[in-house]
């Protein structure tokens, strides 16, 4: 209940956003396997989930288990189509979390008065819609991929961290739940580890509120849900049709979870190539929200600084 009380009011707006975005994603959902929208791994992920195998490093155990569950629960379409529904739900959920995060941030920064409520809801809705229609999120929400689910986990951790930072004395359940989502989300995609940096920063800002017991519980929640990686050696031992590496032994397990074959793609970029890569990233960002969207974002940061 503490979590619910901490969120902005007007849940009907959030529900409307979720249903509208979900309808859009389901309407444009890929009917089966596709390599469009950067979906080169879609066939492998769907087949691995269906057979409960071990996907390419880092293994993606959280995604595989959820995808398998969706393939069993959704009553229509083929296996691949059912798994695509997981991406649509995850993407729509991530959009709603953007709405909640914006509302919470606006309410706690500028006040939750009758005069500002409408403007706050409008601003949060525009932000959520911009995220929903961004080409990358939309494309990853209609195919079998891990990225919309990663967006959902990222949004959940950030919202809970913001909720706790705005009222650290109100209880530690938001922080502990963030640890829970962090551990579970790392079983979906390792890039979630980068969210640990701002989360740690928030904790340092409010370190007086953190007792050894709370820190122990937070680490416990993280470790508990990192245990989802136990799936890999268990299933590798069963010799499924698809099994990358040999996660049944320690060396193969570490090779898989550390994504050893792909480390060079993350940390192997020569320093001389970094400026060009930054330009490419900036171009991707502009194409998601266009120049007007970026201008509005910069304007919002300026307005926030002025208000302080």
Model-derived features with residue positions:
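Transmembrane signal-anchor helices characteristic of membrane glycosylation enzymes that use polyprenol
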Residues: 8-38, 47, 131-133, 189, ...
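Hydrophobic, aromatic-rich transmembrane alpha-helices
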Residues: 287-308
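Aromatic- and kink-enriched transmembrane "portal" helix at the membrane-lumen/periplasm boundary
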Residues: 26-27, 64, 76-84, 109, ...
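Membrane-interface alpha helices of multi-pass inner-membrane proteins
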Residues: 48-51, 127-129, 173-188, 200-203
């Amino acid at each position: 209940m503490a979590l619910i009380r901490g969120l902005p009011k007007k849940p009907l707006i959030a529900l409307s956003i979720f249903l509208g975005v979900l309808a859009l994603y389901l309407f444009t959902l890929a009917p089966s396997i596709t390599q469009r929208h950067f979906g080169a791994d879609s066939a492998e992920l769907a087949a691995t989930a269906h057979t409960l195998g071990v996907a390419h490093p880092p293994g993606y155990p959280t995604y595989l288990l959820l995808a398998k569950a969706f393939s069993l629960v959704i009553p229509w379409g083929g296996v691949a189509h059912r798994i695509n529904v997981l991406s649509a739900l995850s993407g729509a959920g991530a959009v709603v979390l953007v709405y909640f995060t914006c509302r919470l941030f606006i309410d706690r920064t500028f006040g939750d008065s009758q005069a500002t409520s409408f403007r706050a809801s409008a601003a949060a809705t525009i932000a959520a819609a911009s995220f929903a229609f961004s080409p990358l999120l939309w494309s990853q929400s209609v195919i079998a991929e891990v990225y919309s689910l990663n967006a959902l986990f990222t949004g959940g951790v950030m919202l809970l961290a913001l909720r706790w930072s705005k009222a650290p004395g109100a209880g530690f359940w938001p922080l502990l739940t963030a640890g829970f989502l962090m551990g579970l989300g790392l079983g979906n995609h390792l890039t979630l580890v980068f969210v640990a940096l701002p989360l740690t920063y928030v904790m340092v800002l409010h370190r007086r509120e953190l007792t050894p017991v709370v820190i122990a519980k937070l680490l416990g929640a993280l470790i508990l849900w990192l245990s989802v990686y136990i799936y890999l050696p268990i299933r590798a031992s069963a010799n499924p049709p698809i099994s990358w590496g040999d996660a049944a032994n320690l060396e193969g397990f570490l090779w898989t979870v550390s994504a050893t074959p792909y480390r060079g793609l993350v940390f192997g970029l020569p320093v001389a190539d970094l400026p060009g890569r930054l330009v490419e990233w900036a171009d991707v960002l502009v194409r998601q929200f266009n120049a007007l969207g970026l201008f509005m974002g910069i304007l919002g940061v300026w307005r926030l600084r002025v208000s302080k």
